């Protein structure tokens, strides 16, 4: 198995799938790369998932978003939609690399500022509390992301740990778990994407832009909405540099 994985890591990267929770977060990159919405997606007809695709340099780029909830019409954020689209995308597209990109809250106590863009080193859940031996470890689900030392050095990107939960706010229980996870940023999808990708052994990178300061003095939702447009633009710049760096390289070069 190690020999097969070694061969894969030395083969040029060809197909990338971006998993992005909200189309608003993905739109600047969609526009920049001139990606086209796929009308006949490889997904079940019942789902609201949206797929954009196109060629950029030598890369087959696919951006998949969970789309809007069919009942309420709001963006389908959170771990469940993220897990589903990741699973379906791996089966249908068979990517060489998954990039989960999006916005996140940051912690000023860990040095995070609005518009900072982080490459995630380790990801875990903070709201799956199972106080039973071994199941407690399973609940946290801590995983390392695919190592990208050359990319981080070349692009001078910040690195931090990510904690994932299904709430935008932070309860005292969540805060305790996030502290235990030593997280610099928190989101609502990353650990779920990493969990599914790990099952299929698909290398995964998580890149997050900070829209709000969780341990600041302003309401998270207010700060998120205020900074969303500016931070997605900054995220787009970073993602474009990441794609340019990946182009023509193998996984082992990252």
UniProtKB/Swiss-Prot annotation:
It is an enzyme of class 3 (hydrolase). The modification N-acetylmethionine is found at residue 1. Its EC number is 3.2.2.9. It catalyses: S-methyl-5'-thioadenosine + H2O = 5-(methylsulfanyl)-D-ribose + adenine; S-adenosyl-L-homocysteine + H2O = S-(5-deoxy-D-ribos-5-yl)-L-homocysteine + adenine; 5'-deoxyadenosine + H2O = 5-deoxy-D-ribose + adenine. GO terms for molecular function: adenosylhomocysteine nucleosidase activity; methylthioadenosine nucleosidase activity. Disruption phenotype: No visible phenotype. Transmembrane segments: none annotated. S-methyl-5'-thioadenosine binds at residues 103, 186-189. GO terms for biological process: L-methionine salvage from methylthioadenosine; nucleoside metabolic process; phloem or xylem histogenesis. InterPro entries: MTAN, Nucleoside_phosphorylase_d, Nucleoside_phosphorylase_sf. Keywords: Acetylation, Amino-acid biosynthesis, Hydrolase, Methionine biosynthesis. Pathway: Amino-acid biosynthesis; L-methionine biosynthesis via salvage pathway; S-methyl-5-thio-alpha-D-ribose 1-phosphate from S-methyl-5'-thioadenosine (hydrolase route): step 1/2. The active site is at residues 25, 212. Signal peptide: none annotated. Enzyme of the methionine cycle that catalyzes the irreversible cleavage of the glycosidic bond in 5'-methylthioadenosine (MTA) and S-adenosylhomocysteine (SAH/AdoHcy) to a lesser extent, to adenine and the corresponding thioribose, 5'-methylthioribose and S-ribosylhomocysteine, respectively. Contributes to the maintenance of AdoMet homeostasis and is required to sustain high rates of ethylene synthesis. Belongs to the PNP/UDP phosphorylase family. MtnN subfamily. Homodimer. PANTHER family: 5'-METHYLTHIOADENOSINE/S-ADENOSYLHOMOCYSTEINE NUCLEOSIDASE 1, 5'-METHYLTHIOADENOSINE_S-ADENOSYLHOMOCYSTEINE NUCLEOSIDASE. This is 5'-methylthioadenosine/S-adenosylhomocysteine nucleosidase. It comes from Arabidopsis thaliana (Mouse-ear cress). The gene is MTN2.
